[in-house]
């Protein structure tokens, strides 16, 4: 074959008929880019083919221009433009610390970045500088996931400085939606005048009562009283005093020294008092910012069911999502607990006293829904199980109960501001297995068992915090111990319970205005020692027992139709003596 050359064939290897089109295949290897970047990172670690050194502080980082330019518009502009850095072998980056820059260049090569509480505040601005927008978004997402009443205002300020528009809106909405808890924190007290005005003037502010806004203003002024006193009138302009109850205006607002000493503020108070003197139809004709009800965005809620007997005391806590009709297990209690009092106060769920399977306890655990975590706080002064618990005027009241030997008439209150318990006036009757509720600023203790007469009780007492006195109100129509007590639309409901061996399904409701009880529709099932809560105009009764077994079912009452409906989904565990609270669904 000497002198001959190999010529390419003019015929394709695969031939098709004349009537068929030429065929071809394009393939994309999804792993190719990842492998390529992995090799480039290995070359960088060995300082092979590197053509630039990036310097920040005392940290020097070898890299490849083409890789940096491909992933960062900042570096692309630097290396392809007319700046001196386009040809420099060593480039200093200012306004970024060396460790952060190293992490970001690692990200360019590996697509991996760790965002933490410790580094997010330096990582986000550095990612913004290098125009690594995915990292910047990761930082924003992380901060959004960390929003909490104690930090949302700080995150809002950070987002504002760095023009993170979505995060700014999310943090601001969070502050509005959790205002009763936000106002208690150092961040709120450190806000500027304009920032406070902007927050409390929002129609979206979520408060159960305008009292919270008034209290927030007083707290902010008193935090630096000498320098802030002059701003009192400007702040009170945004407090919707006409929407406050008349008793609160007279007993609290009018008696506040900061109001008494300011003529403009006194004018706002007079305006509110005049508003209350008007008939309802005339009130509706008054159009000014202080008479306009706030219209907060409705936050989704979840129901927390804490501990209970199943059949022994348990640590389990379940969470019900109303929107999704789903039960989930959340963080367990630190120790077994049943027959406890459970309430929601200042953004947290409190589990108070109870029985741990062997002893009645004084201890109190607090649940943070954002962190999904329980912590312990100051213990009560007395051991109490089968107590009643309720919140009134920012105090948690522990009412009656059983200490292991006798029923209790004593009542103590807890202030989360001081982390201290103190006794208030005792009830007239010892009551264990007592139900409690708060209506129109009064605390009610309903039924129970007195231990002395060895009978279940039909009597009801009312506590007035202004006078520190308990007085009897109208009796229920029947004796009820272990009744589930809840409040809906300003009325007090007593559900189920028992009288000796007889477990009830009957329900009656108390109207404070007329001091009368009336029967409403029976529940679907007999229940005693059930948890009760009100959500979205419905009254939920959770678990309990029917005298023979613990119940996993939940039913709710609609006062419009006077009907009870069973939830389609049961708890995973039948439990009696569980506590129930409703919280905003954590983000």
Swiss-Prot record:
Pathway: Protein modification; protein ubiquitination. It is found in: Cytoplasm, Cytoskeleton; Cytoplasm, Cytosol. The modification Phosphoserine is found at residues 10, 376, 433. Keywords: Actin-binding, Cytoplasm, Cytoskeleton, Kelch repeat, Phosphoprotein, Repeat, Ubl conjugation pathway. Residues 50-117 form the BTB domain. The keyword Zinc does not apply. Substrate-specific adapter of a BCR (BTB-CUL3-RBX1) E3 ubiquitin ligase complex that acts as a regulator of ion transport in the distal nephron. The BCR(KLHL3) complex acts by mediating ubiquitination and degradation of WNK1 and WNK4, two activators of Na-Cl cotransporter SLC12A3/NCC in distal convoluted tubule cells of kidney, thereby regulating NaCl reabsorption. The BCR(KLHL3) complex also mediates ubiquitination and degradation of WNK3. This is Kelch-like protein 3.
């Amino acid at each position: 074959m000497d002198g001959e050359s190999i010529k390419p064939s003019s015929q394709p290897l695969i031939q098709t008929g004349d009537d068929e089109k030429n065929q071809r295949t394009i393939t994309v290897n999804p792993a190719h880019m990842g492998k390529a970047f992995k090799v480039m990172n290995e070359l960088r670690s060995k300082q092979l083919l590197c053509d630039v050194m990036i310097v920040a502080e005392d940290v020097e980082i070898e890299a490849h221009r083409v890789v940096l330019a491909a992933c960062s518009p900042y570096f692309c502009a630097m290396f392809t433009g007319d700046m001196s850095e386009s040809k420099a072998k060593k480039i200093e980056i200012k306004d970024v610390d060396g460790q952060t820059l190293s992490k970001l260049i690692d990200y360019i090569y590996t697509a991996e970045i760790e965002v933490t509480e410790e580094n997010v505040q330096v990582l986000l601005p550095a990612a913004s500088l290098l125009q690594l927008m995915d990292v910047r978004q990761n930082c924003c997402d992380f901060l959004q996931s960390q929003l909490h009443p104690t930090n949302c205002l700080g995150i809002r300020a950070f987002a504002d400085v760095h023009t993170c528009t979505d995060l700014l809106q999310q943090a601001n909405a969070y502050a509005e939606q959790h205002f009763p808890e936000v106002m208690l924190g150092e961040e709120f007290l450190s806000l500027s005048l304009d920032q406070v005005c902007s927050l409390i003037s929002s129609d979206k502010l979520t408060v159960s009562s305008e009292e919270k806004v008034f209290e927030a203003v007083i707290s902010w002024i008193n935090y630096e009283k000498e320098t802030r006193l002059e701003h009192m009138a400007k702040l009170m302009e945004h407090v919707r005093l006409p929407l406050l109850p008349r008793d609160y205006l007279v007993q609290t607002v009018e008696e506040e020294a900061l109001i008494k000493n300011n003529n403009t503020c006194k004018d706002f108070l007079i305006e509110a008092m005049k508003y209350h003197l008007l008939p309802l139809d005339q009130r509706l004709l008054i159009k000014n910012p202080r008479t306009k009800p706030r219209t907060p965005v409705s936050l989704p809620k979840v129901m927390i069911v804490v501990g209970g007997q199943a059949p022994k005391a348990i640590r389990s806590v379940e969470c019900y999502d109303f929107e999704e009709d789903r039960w989930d297990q959340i963080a367990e209690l630190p120790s077994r607990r049943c027959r406890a009092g459970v309430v929601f106060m200042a953004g947290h769920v409190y589990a108070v006293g109870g029985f741990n399977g062997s002893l009645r306890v004084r201890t109190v655990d607090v649940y943070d829904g954002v962190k999904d975590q329980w912590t312990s706080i100051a213990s009560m002064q007395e051991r109490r199980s089968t107590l009643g618990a309720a919140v009134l005027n920012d105090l948690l009241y522990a009412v009656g109960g059983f200490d292991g030997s006798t029923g209790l008439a004593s009542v103590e209150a807890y202030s989360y501001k001081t982390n201290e318990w103190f006794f208030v006036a005792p009830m007239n009757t010892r009551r264990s297995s007592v139900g409690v509720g708060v209506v129109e600023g009064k605390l009610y203790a309903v039924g129970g068992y007195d231990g002395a007469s060895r009978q279940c009780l039909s009597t009801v007492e009312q506590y007035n915090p202004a006078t520190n006195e308990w007085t009897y109100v109208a009796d229920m129509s029947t004796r009820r111990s272990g009744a589930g007590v809840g409040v809906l639309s300003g009325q007090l409901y007593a559900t189920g319970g028992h009288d000796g061996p007889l477990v009830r399904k009957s329900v009656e409701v108390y109207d404070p205005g007329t001091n009368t009880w009336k029967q409403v529709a029976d529940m679907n099932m007999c229940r005693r020692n059930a948890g009760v809560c009100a959500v979205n105009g419905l009254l939920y009764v959770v678990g309990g027992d029917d005298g023979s077994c613990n119940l996993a079912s939940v039913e709710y009452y609609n006062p419009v139709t006077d009907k009870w409906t069973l939830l389609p989904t049961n708890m995973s565990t039948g439990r009696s003596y569980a506590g129930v609270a409703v919280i905003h669904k954590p983000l």
